[in-house]
Amino acid sequence: MTAIIDIVGREILDSRGNPTVEVDVVLEDGSFGRAAVPSGASTGAHEAVELRDGGSRYLGKGVEKAVEAVNGKIFDAIAGMDAESQLLIDQTMIELDGSANKGNIGANAILGVSLAVAKAAAQATGLPLYRYVGGANAHVLPVPMMNIINGGAHADNPIDFQEFMILPVGASSVREAVRYGSEVFHTLKKRLKDAGHNTNVGDEGGFAPNLKNAQAALDFIMESIEKAGFKPGEDIALGLDCAATEFFKDGNYVYEGERKTRDPKAQAKYLAKLASDYPIVTIEDGMAEDDWEGWKYLTDLIGDKCQLVGDDLFVTNSARLRDGIRMGVANSILVKVNQIGSLSETLDAVETAHKAGYTAVMSHRSGETEDSTIADLAVATNCGQIKTGSLARSDRTAKYNQLIRIEEELGKQARYAGRNALKFL
């Protein structure tokens, strides 16, 4: 009854207007699953590879080759398989690709099928996706990391850090957390406008004002939190995504906006000072993806009092994560389904992190769609934290809205992670 009888891949557009892969999977009993694949702007060198067409069509970014793989090789390989055999299906596709980075048939092709299979199987069993994937104990609603000021590769402004985030740790529910975020977001918009700044939004829905440095961005956010009636650090904490690989050049961190250069130790000390001066509880990619010594220095410096998240460092890859665990580097992993390219490997990365005492943060990409799968996966894994952008743009709010629905559906079983999501609070 849960045998796969049809798979249809198609080319659709993501939130940046670039092509991406969408996949429909149909089972023998008529159950149906659909998944759309996200895409990043600042991508780690060690990520699984999206298959793009090249040439002039869509300026080289077309995904017809990946769609062809879905409708051809992948369908031929997994047609008739039981959709509930997720691991076997994912392994079959990985072996079909045959490369270390999924570059032959494309991580975007494999992931689209992997997620659509899980959704179809969930429908066949009569369970919501978070319950199907996570089992009976899936009940923790994640604290959102809301990206309200954008810089770096996500915006055209002088700020070198990529994201400045708020975390509503003091809220009592995800519904309240979304309200906290929305009120701060709109307060920030007014304050930026009153100060003469542009209030257009970046790729992830946050504002992209021309501010001179990170401190200026953090000051605006702190003022907006207070003006909205909340207490910084108590109701709402702060987070950074430095995306440091983007400005790591010849062994140093080159801040073009500030016209400063910091060596790895100076970079770590700068981040430590920011975390001391502001209620910053999480820093993502504070060091570059291959600056293992810098990461170790940063972890030794503030790893006992701040969440240090590896994104480009770990790329949702259990093998790289195990290297980091062994070296005592970072204390958290960012989880992006398209970095590794299959649901099974994504779940394995979360499990590896939790076993080692590392936290895990479920995450979107800057190029998103209306697909809200990551909201379900955040609850399924009880990871307690989610990064899915700002409080604007429907490609971002779709995930918040899904979390609100899940919380409502869980009723009294639902538990908002709140301050418990971060061991340092």
Curated annotation (Swiss-Prot):
Its EC number is 4.2.1.11. Gene3D superfamilies: Enolase-like C-terminal domain (3.20.20.120), Enolase-like, N-terminal domain (3.30.390.10). InterPro entries: Enolase, Enolase-like_C_sf, Enolase-like_N, Enolase_C, Enolase_CS, Enolase_N. Binds a second Mg(2+) ion via substrate during catalysis. GO terms for cellular component: cell surface; extracellular region; phosphopyruvate hydratase complex. The active site is at 204 (proton donor), 336 (proton acceptor). It comes from the Bacteria. Keywords: Cytoplasm, Glycolysis, Lyase, Magnesium, Metal-binding, Secreted. Its cofactor is Mg(2+). Belongs to the enolase family. Catalyzes the reversible conversion of 2-phosphoglycerate (2-PG) into phosphoenolpyruvate (PEP). It is essential for the degradation of carbohydrates via glycolysis. This is Enolase. The lineage of its organism: Bacteria, Pseudomonadati, Pseudomonadota, Alphaproteobacteria, Hyphomicrobiales. The gene is eno.
